[in-house]
């Protein structure tokens, strides 16, 4: 009997555990169903948004008792992550508040907490979407207009803070302005004087703020035909136009209007006092930008009109399209489909809006959010999905860009080249080149022929030389790239007169017979250090002829492909290192790569990248070589700046990696010390597994890491000093010579060069910013020509 009773008890225990698991499983299913219903509310279905909301409110109201916290979390997440459905979710919250006042208060508290947390963690978009949601809850009678105005006033108070960056003040003003389209009408009707007072404070701030950064962020230097407006100025003009229209806009869907009779009966909540967190030096704020304009209503002849540049609808449409790209940019097909499914597509010329927004992203200064190819691939998918209209709009946009290229920012010029060449490669390189042949009459340094030349160079990377030659009209012959073959001087007719020819031929035989690096060194040691016509140090610290013979011979033998060249460099890595002991020797290596491969830009780029990775040449040597007299003829070509930027990026990544490793080591050391002190005080073993002795870095290791980081920072600073000093020297020389000769200094060469200086500042702004005070003290001093100094001052103003 006793065994039977024990058996029964075990069965009861098993049943209890099984029932508990079933309940947990059932609860999880209900939670998943609730989440799915909330996420999909308002999306296209057989029923209207209003009936969707009514049904969902009934479901949620029944489940509030059990799943209150889950529902709160899902709704607050939707507010931040799905801002395009803001008014749908505020209506949902409003209806729930009308039925359950306590839940409404809990949601407001939860949303306020989300807002404050976003500000504290510098999640600026999340904070702005949270603020917008809170504001729209005023329309749904959940939050009182008075308490919202108090919050908006508190945020505008930040604009009066002293000794904080302007970008901080700008963001708080932008957050308030971008919220007003949702709630402006309600505030106008209920609290007009308070709203006007708020707008007056904003206007005072906007009138006194500095816009030194504006010119650095422009896509074009000219304002014709479309003004290049700074983002806050543009939004302020749009808000003023909205105010003139009595805050009536035509874009935002407002499902709560249908439920006004229910919502107006609900009790409202007051927002608590919210104080923005004070500024800290480690806070990073969004940088300013210039609003991109490519089209106006005259460019869209058929169908609905494009909203004016200062209509609030233009801002709302563009923001929505930007958010779609942000959400779906990882998957180009989904992104294109979502863009074409824009909910208000019948009210606007959608294809024009999409193309303008994508180019706005591509040309965004200082850098685009995503890789250039991301935007190119999305445009290709759009052309596939909408073949009847989108290719024509894109061709129209390309024509506009080409006609305005004379005043285009240099960084945007590069991106335009990269996009157009990529786009052509996906459409059989078909283009109506004859329409652009007027550019052939212009000087070779003019942006139009330069654009076509650079596009063909990029197309060559994506195709082959014969294909490029066949696709172009014969009139473009002078712009077609040279055949990309090595120029190996030791095989030329004049080779017999060159001092290294005999050894070069010996080296060819030895390498083909798979000789070792040591055997190569033995062959090279017979080369005399004198009698070489190339540049060489007077003290003979390196043998230029040795480098010449070795580099040109080895790379010529590996010229069949990138892989062959890489294999050759890797095999004879030790020989390269032995020959490249000084910076001058490294520059000599670069000189020989250029001499061999001057007709193959891509080969030069990848070879120099490989030499940097293998630490055969230093970053500073590459920078010095780029600004050498030898490269004067190449100075305005894109590939040279591609090399400089990959060099700087290589250095930046090295510094960031060392910084990260040091921080990680310090954290481990601190945690290990903390664990050991805890173990002395606490005999309990119920704590997290401590860091083992093997994981703990020693203080000596941390010190060595600090020394490595310090050395890397010194090298990084030196690299930037070399680059900026060389820019200053050549630009100052040009300006002085022009002044002396009485010539206009504003030549094509000057515009390219000053544009490249600006590009270095903007592309690497995060790293250069660390050394801005050093640069100001040593290089960009007050006695420098204002044209050069302005570029530096505009850069500093970006974070001021």
Curated annotation (Swiss-Prot):
GO terms for cellular component: nuclear cap binding complex; nucleus; postsynaptic cytosol; presynaptic cytosol. SMART domains: MIF4G. InterPro entries: ARM-type_fold, CBP80, MIF4G-like_typ-1, MIF4G-like_typ-2, MIF4G-like_typ-3. One of its GO terms (biological process) is primary miRNA processing. Keywords: mRNA capping, mRNA processing, mRNA splicing, Nucleus, Phosphoprotein, RNA-mediated gene silencing. Residues 1-26, 669-700 are annotated as: Disordered. It comes from the Eukaryota. Belongs to the NCBP1 family. Component of the cap-binding complex (CBC), which binds cotranscriptionally to the 5'-cap of pre-mRNAs and is involved in various processes such as pre-mRNA splicing and RNA-mediated gene silencing (RNAi). The CBC complex is involved in miRNA-mediated RNA interference via its interaction with Ars2 and is required for primary microRNAs (miRNAs) processing. Also involved in innate immunity via the short interfering RNAs (siRNAs) processing machinery by restricting the viral RNA production. Component of the nuclear cap-binding complex (CBC), a heterodimer composed of Cbp80 and Cbp20 that interacts with m7GpppG-capped RNA. This is Nuclear cap-binding protein subunit 1. It comes from Drosophila yakuba (Fruit fly). The gene is Cbp80.
């Amino acid at each position: 009997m006793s065994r039977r009773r024990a058996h029964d008890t075990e069965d009861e225990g098993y049943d209890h555990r099984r029932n508990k698991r079933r309940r947990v499983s059932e609860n999880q299913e209900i939670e998943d169903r609730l989440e799915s219903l909330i996420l999909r509310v308002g999306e296209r279905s057989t029923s209207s948004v209003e009936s969707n909301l009514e049904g969902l409110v009934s479901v949620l109201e029944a489940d509030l008792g059990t799943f209150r916290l889950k529902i709160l979390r899902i709704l607050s997440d939707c507010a931040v992550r799905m801002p395009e459905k803001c008014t749908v979710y505020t209506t949902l919250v409003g209806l729930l508040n009308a039925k359950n006042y306590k839940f409404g208060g809990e949601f407001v508290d939860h949303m306020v907490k989300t807002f404050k947390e976003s500000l504290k963690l510098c999640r600026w978009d999340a904070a702005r979407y949270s603020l917008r949601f809170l504001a729209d809850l005023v329309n749904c009678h959940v939050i009182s207009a008075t308490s919202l105005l108090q919050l908006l006033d508190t945020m505008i108070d930040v604009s009066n803070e002293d000794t904080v960056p302007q970008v901080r003040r700008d963001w708080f003003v932008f957050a308030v302005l971008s919220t007003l389209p949702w709630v402006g009408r309600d505030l106008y009707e209920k609290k007009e004087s308070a709203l006007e007072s708020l707008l007056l404070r904003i206007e005072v701030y906007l009138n006194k703020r500095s816009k030194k950064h504006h010119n650095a962020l422009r896509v074009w230097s000219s304002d014709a035909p479309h003004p290049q407006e700074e983002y806050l100025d543009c939004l302020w003009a749009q808000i003023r136009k909205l105010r003139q229209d009595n805050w009536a806009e035509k874009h935002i869907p407002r499902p709560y209007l249908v439920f006004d009779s229910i919502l107006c009966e609900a009790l409202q909540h007051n927002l608590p006092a919210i104080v923005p967190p004070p500024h800290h030096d480690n806070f990073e704020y969004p940088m300013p930008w210039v609003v991109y304009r490519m089209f106006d209503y005259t460019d869209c002849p058929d169908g609905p009109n494009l909203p004016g540049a200062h209509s609030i609808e233009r801002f709302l449409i563009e923001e929505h399209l930007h958010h779609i790209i942000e959400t779906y940019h990882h998957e180009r097909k989904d992104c294109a489909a979502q863009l074409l499914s824009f909910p208000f597509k019948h009210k606007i010329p959608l294809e024009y809006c999409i193309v303008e927004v994508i180019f706005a992203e591509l040309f965004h200064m200082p850098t685009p959010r995503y890789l250039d190819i991301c935007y190119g691939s999305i445009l290709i998918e759009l052309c596939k999905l909408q073949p009847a209209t989108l290719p024509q709009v894109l061709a129209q946009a390309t024509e506009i860009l080409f006609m305005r290229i004379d005043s285009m920012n240099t960084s945007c010029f590069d991106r335009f080249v990269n996009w157009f060449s990529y786009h052509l490669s996906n459409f059989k390189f078909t283009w109506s080149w004859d329409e652009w042949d007027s550019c052939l009459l212009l000087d070779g340094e003019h942006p139009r022929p330069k654009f076509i030349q650079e596009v063909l160079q990029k197309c060559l990377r994506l195709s082959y030389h014969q294909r490029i030659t066949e696709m172009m009209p014969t009139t473009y012959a002078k712009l077609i790239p040279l055949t990309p073959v090595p120029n190996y001087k030791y095989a030329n007719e004049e080779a017999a007169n060159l001092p290294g020819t005999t050894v070069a031929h010996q080296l060819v035989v030895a390498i083909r017979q798979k000789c070792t690096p040591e055997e190569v060194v033995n062959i090279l040691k017979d080369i005399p250090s004198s009698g070489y016509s190339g540049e060489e140090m007077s003290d003979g610290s390196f043998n230029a002829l040795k480098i010449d013979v070795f580099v040109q011979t080895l790379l010529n033998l590996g010229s069949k492909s990138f892989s062959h060249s890489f294999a050759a460099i890797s095999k004879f890595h030790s020989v390269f290192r032995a020959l490249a002991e000084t910076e001058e020797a490294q520059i000599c290596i670069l000189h020989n790569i250029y001499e061999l491969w001057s007709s193959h830009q891509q080969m030069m780029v990848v070879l120099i990248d490989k030499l940097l990775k293998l630490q055969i040449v230093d970053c500073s040597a590459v920078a010095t070589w780029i600004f050498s007299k030898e490269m004067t003829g190449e100075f305005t070509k894109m590939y040279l700046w591609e090399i400089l930027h990959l060099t700087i990026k290589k250095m930046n990544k090295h510094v960031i990696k060392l910084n990260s490793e040091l921080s990680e080591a310090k954290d481990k050391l601190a945690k290990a010390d903390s664990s050991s002190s805890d173990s002395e005080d606490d005999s309990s073993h119920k704590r997290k597994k401590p860091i083992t002795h093997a994981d703990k870095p020693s203080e000596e290791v941390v010190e060595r890491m600090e020394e490595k980081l310090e050395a890397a920072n010194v090298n990084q600073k030196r690299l930037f000093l070399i680059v900026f000093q060389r820019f200053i020297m050549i630009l100052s020389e040009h300006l002085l010579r022009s002044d002396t000769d009485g010539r206009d200094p504003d030549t094509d060469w000057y515009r390219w060069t000053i544009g490249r200086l600006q590009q270095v500042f903007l592309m690497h702004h995060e790293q250069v910013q660390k050394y801005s005070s050093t640069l100001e003290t040593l290089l960009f001093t007050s006695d420098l020509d204002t044209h050069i100094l302005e570029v530096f001052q505009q850069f500093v103003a970006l974070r001021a």
